[in-house]
């Protein structure tokens, strides 16, 4: 990624709230955390493409859970302001995701870049410090399948992603900017950190968290008019994730205006060039995504206290080679690729051992040995959480890495792990007998 990184001097001049002297009276609930840190949203608007298409709202703003009438109902119902949220918690951090829904993603280039329904969003990483609400550490935003990373902490540095700048605050609320339709050639409503500038084109509104969902009535002026929004916990739509009236396929929201079926739910987001942070890990495993994207995170745990939005937990414990698969009898360069529903969830970037002697057990820790991503993780761990359809096949493949000549298959293990069950393999022989693997897969 080639993205502009703000200078350290610029970062240090940005405003961030301090809570180091806060007195803890109680541990905040997740809804209280979400309200405390809820972003202030600087929403650009474009009257040329119907200004109401730039209003944030809930998916069922028109009173139903039908994806294919949201475009056409835009002028028939008020787009009262809602933001979807969810919270995950590890031993050291809270991860609070906020997602913005718009009924239309429109463009001057119709039918290109225009489609029915649209989700973009952000998540905050909050360090648990003993205070009621913790302290802000960083923010990641999503704009058209591209992640952007922001922090005011100079010790946090680029990993697979760059640090794109700092974060302005209004009290405890980070300021974010949401594009209007027609502003970007890749579509509308991408979210980035707000930089303090005027609204593009001179018209834009501000959404403040108030707990009351308001409908904007005046969009004139550069962020002159403020409107309140309410929060909706994501369980409402997540519980409908298999509803064909909403989704055309896993993680893809149905739509039949202009470019069909082009909106992704957060578990379908995928930045193709952000290293070993794979599709939907912002949703199912935000600790892993952040640890891939950035370095200098300090004490940063991957052990979840609460993580409600995943389908499969995959623990890769150890592997041993039983065959020398390199050319001319050379020792195998082994790695594991776990698949769920046919999609890879780990690969040689996570862990690899070059020239592995036969019959020797190697314990797996991401970033260890000869991992192609290198030793860039904050702690030793060997677990990923993914969000894929339930009751689909899980395969644990062992490969010999041969670079450009093509990797050799050393066999696999396979199982359908139903929700509420766990599959454990201990020194299990792979399908072709060329490796043994110990792994545990749990589903919920």
Where is each model-derived feature located?
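Positively charged n-region of N-terminal signal peptides that target proteins for export
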Residues: 1-4
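Tryptophan-paired
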Residues: 343-390
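C2 and C2-like phospholipid-binding beta-sandwich domains
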Residues: 323-335, 365-385, 395-441
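Generic short beta-strand segments
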Residues: 97-107, 315-322, 398-401
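Domain-length functional cores that host ligand/cofactor binding and catalytic or interaction surfaces
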Residues: 29-32, 90, 110-121, 129-311, ...
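Sec-dependent signal peptide cleavage junction
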Residues: 15-28
């Amino acid at each position: 990624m080639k993205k502009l990184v703000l200078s350290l001097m610029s970062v240090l001049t940005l405003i961030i709230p301090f809570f180091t002297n806060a007195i803890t009276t109680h541990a905040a609930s997740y809804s209280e955390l979400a309200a405390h840190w809820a972003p202030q949203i600087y929403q650009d608007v474009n009257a040329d493409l119907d200004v109401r298409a730039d209003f944030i709202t809930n998916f069922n703003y028109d009173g139903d859970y039908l994806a294919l009438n949201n475009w056409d109902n835009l002028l028939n119902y008020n787009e009262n302001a809602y933001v979807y949220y969810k919270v995950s918690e590890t031993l050291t951090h809270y991860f609070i995701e906020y997602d913005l829904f718009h009924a239309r993603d429109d463009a001057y280039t119709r039918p290109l870049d225009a489609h029915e329904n649209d989700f973009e969003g952000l998540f905050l990483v909050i360090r648990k410090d003993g205070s009621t609400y913790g302290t802000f550490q960083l923010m990641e935003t999503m704009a058209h399948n591209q992640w952007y990373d922001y922090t005011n902490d100079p010790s946090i540095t680029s990993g697979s992603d760059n640090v794109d700048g700092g974060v302005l605050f209004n009290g405890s609320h980070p300021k974010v900017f949401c594009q209007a339709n027609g502003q970007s050639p890749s579509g509308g409503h991408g979210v980035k950190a707000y930089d303090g500038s005027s609204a593009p084109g001179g018209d834009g509104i501000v959404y403040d968290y108030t707990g009351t969902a308001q409908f904007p009535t005046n969009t004139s002026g550069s962020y002159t008019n403020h409107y309140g929004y309410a929060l909706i916990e994501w369980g409402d739509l997540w519980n409908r994730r298999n509803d064909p009236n909403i989704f055309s396929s896993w993680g893809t929201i149905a739509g039949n205006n202009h470019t069909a079926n082009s909106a992704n739910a957060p578990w379908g987001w995928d930045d193709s060039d952000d290293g070993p942070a794979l599709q939907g890990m912002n949703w199912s495993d935000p600790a892993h995504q952040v640890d891939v994207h950035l370095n200098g995170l300090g004490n940063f745990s991957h052990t979840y206290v609460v993580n409600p939005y995943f389908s499969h937990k995959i623990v890769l414990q150890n592997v041993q080679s039983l065959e020398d698969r390199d050319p001319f009898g050379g020792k195998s360069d082994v790695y594991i690729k776990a698949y769920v529903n046919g999609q890879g969830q780990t690969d040689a970037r996570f862990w690899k051992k070059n020239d592995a002697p036969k019959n020797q057990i190697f314990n797996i820790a991401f970033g260890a040995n000869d991992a192609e991503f290198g030793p860039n993780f904050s702690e030793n761990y060997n677990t990923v959480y993914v969000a894929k359809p339930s009751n689909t096949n899980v395969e644990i493949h062992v490969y010999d890495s041969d670079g450009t000549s093509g990797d050799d298959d050393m066999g696999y293990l396979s199982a359908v792990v139903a929700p509420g069950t766990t599959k454990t393999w201990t020194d299990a022989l792979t399908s072709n007998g060329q490796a043994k693997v110990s792994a545990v897969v749990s589903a919920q």
